[in-house]
């Protein structure tokens, strides 16, 4: 960030010192470009002695201080670089402020970044850091506003949708988080990751089967061997009594693949019960209990008790 910028504030030096400074300034840059960082260090320090008001040299000094774990010196140099040339040297200074775990410094960083953003409307890196700063301080609504700015630069895409989803989830606004996922799926319906996110959000927010079924169907189209989704689809079909034969077919596949899974056995047993096959229902529900171990799911016990009562 600004490692190879032009020298600043040399007009206050004598002609002789200007020439001397420029020679060593560009030599330091050459060495840094060649990744001879340690070799460049004494030259940078000499440049600082010649001209302590050069933004680039202060930035270098700050970065060297960071490698030496001298936090106070690093903060001073990087702050000075920012003061001398805010548009060029905002990045390292604000990274340090945001990492400080000092809320006053973090708020200061936000204020400065906001002011910079007012005069640099197309700086993606600047807006990205401002958004991170808002997230650090849990100002998620402000972070969402910044996302609008980022979208005006990059356009709306998967990364934007993901960030909007996360920020709304942080705000515990599950309804809007779902809308963000659904919005992107209208553009890219074959995006498996987003289909999974939608399904998980639906499950977390206990959406009705009418919403869950299409979500499971979409994933199965892309991942037809996903038996967990297969089981959940079968269960939701069973809940609303829709296409019980298909529910039975899907559920049968799950218990064939995992014959000791109590959840899958329970689903199959309950579908058998809904189909009126009492003997099979009790057989599979009992197996679900047997394979549950010490902790038996209450729902499995409820299903077994209800089936036992009605299938006498």
Where are each of the predicted segments found?
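Short coil turns that delineate tetratricopeptide repeat
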Residues: 18, 52, 86, 121, ...
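Register position in tetratricopeptide repeats
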Residues: 33-34, 67-68, 100-102, 136, ...
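TPR-adjacent "capping" and linker segments in tetratricopeptide-repeat scaffold/adaptor proteins
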Residues: 9-23
